């Protein structure tokens, strides 16, 4: 299954706010709560609930079905909480790190920056969005006016809060990966254990 390229608000209305997918936030009106008193909400099956959580993860991080399955399989082979390890793997993708630094408004935009050769990791240009960043990696912007202007412009509109596992000097456009992200710093309303359960027969 390829990446979704349709209307983003349609997905947000169905799954809830997905910060990495779109910076547009779902509007919750009081009138919709009143309607809920008249119309009973359809009860979801356990499978549907797991599917919904899986879709949240896939859309938010912009990965394909096959990629997500591979991440789950890798997480299962690592000692610890499979759900948290899965989230850490997705959070350490280069496109997500660029988004978290505020260099891009969404992960999709961050992916384009990487694809177009604007991003440097440890003094080497990296054009693979799924590149897995590691603690002590130094991430910077390619030293040309086009790259620096694009990212400086994005930063001027960014209000993202920098998580403690990242350090960033905006003046020089140089960032450092301090370590792995803690679960509490992942701004996504999701039950990652249900995602692991969804893939339990496949992974």
From Swiss-Prot:
<dbReference type="GO" id="GO:0006412">
    <property type="term" value="P:translation"/>
</dbReference>
<keyword id="KW-0699">rRNA-binding</keyword>
<keyword id="KW-0687">Ribonucleoprotein</keyword>
<keyword id="KW-0689">Ribosomal protein</keyword>
<comment type="function">
    <text>With S5 and S12 plays an important role in translational accuracy.</text>
</comment>
<keyword id="KW-0934">Plastid</keyword>
<comment type="function">
    <text>One of the primary rRNA binding proteins, it binds directly to 16S rRNA where it nucleates assembly of the body of the 30S subunit.</text>
</comment>
<protein>
    <recommendedName>
        <fullName>Small ribosomal subunit protein uS4c</fullName>
    </recommendedName>
</protein>
<dbReference type="InterPro" id="IPR018079">
    <property type="entry name" value="Ribosomal_uS4_CS"/>
</dbReference>
<comment type="subunit">
    <text>Part of the 30S ribosomal subunit. Contacts protein S5. The interaction surface between S4 and S5 is involved in control of translational fidelity.</text>
</comment>
<dbReference type="GO" id="GO:0042274">
    <property type="term" value="P:ribosomal small subunit biogenesis"/>
</dbReference>
<keyword id="KW-0694">RNA-binding</keyword>
<dbReference type="InterPro" id="IPR001912">
    <property type="entry name" value="Ribosomal_uS4_N"/>
</dbReference>
<dbReference type="InterPro" id="IPR005709">
    <property type="entry name" value="Ribosomal_uS4_bac-type"/>
</dbReference>
<dbReference type="InterPro" id="IPR002942">
    <property type="entry name" value="S4_RNA-bd"/>
</dbReference>
<dbReference type="GO" id="GO:0015935">
    <property type="term" value="C:small ribosomal subunit"/>
</dbReference>
<dbReference type="GO" id="GO:0009507">
    <property type="term" value="C:chloroplast"/>
</dbReference>
<feature type="domain" description="S4 RNA-binding">
    <location>
        <begin position="92"/>
        <end position="150"/>
    </location>
</feature>
<keyword id="KW-0150">Chloroplast</keyword>
<dbReference type="Pfam" id="PF00163">
    <property type="entry name" value="Ribosomal_S4"/>
</dbReference>
<dbReference type="Pfam" id="PF01479">
    <property type="entry name" value="S4"/>
</dbReference>
<dbReference type="GO" id="GO:0003735">
    <property type="term" value="F:structural constituent of ribosome"/>
</dbReference>
<dbReference type="GO" id="GO:0019843">
    <property type="term" value="F:rRNA binding"/>
</dbReference>
<dbReference type="InterPro" id="IPR022801">
    <property type="entry name" value="Ribosomal_uS4"/>
</dbReference>
<comment type="similarity">
    <text>Belongs to the universal ribosomal protein uS4 family.</text>
</comment>
<dbReference type="InterPro" id="IPR036986">
    <property type="entry name" value="S4_RNA-bd_sf"/>
</dbReference>
């Amino acid at each position: 299954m390829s990446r979704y390229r349709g209307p983003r608000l349609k997905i947000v209305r169905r799954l809830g706010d997905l910060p990495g997918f779109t910076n547009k936030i779902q509007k919750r009106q009081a009138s919709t709560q009143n309607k809920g008193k008249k119309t009973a909400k359809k009860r979801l099956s356990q499978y549907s609930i797991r599917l919904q959580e899986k879709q949240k993860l896939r859309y938010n991080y912009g990965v394909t079905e096959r990629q997500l399955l591979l991440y789950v399989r890798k997480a299962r082979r690592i000692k610890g909480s499979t759900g948290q390890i899965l989230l850490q793997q997705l959070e350490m993708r280069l496109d997500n790190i660029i988004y978290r630094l505020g260099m891009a408004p969404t992960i999709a935009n961050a992916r384009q920056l990487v694809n177009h050769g604007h991003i440097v990791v440890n003094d080497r240009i990296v054009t693979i969005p799924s590149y897995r960043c590691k603690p002590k990696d130094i991430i910077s912007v390619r030293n040309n006016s086009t790259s620096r202007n694009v990212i400086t412009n994005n930063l001027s509109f960014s209000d993202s809060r920098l998580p403690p596992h990242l350090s960033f000097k905006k003046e020089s456009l140089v960032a450092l990966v301090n370590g792995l992200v803690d679960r509490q710093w992942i701004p996504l309303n999701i039950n990652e254990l249900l995602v692991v359960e969804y893939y339990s027969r496949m992974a």
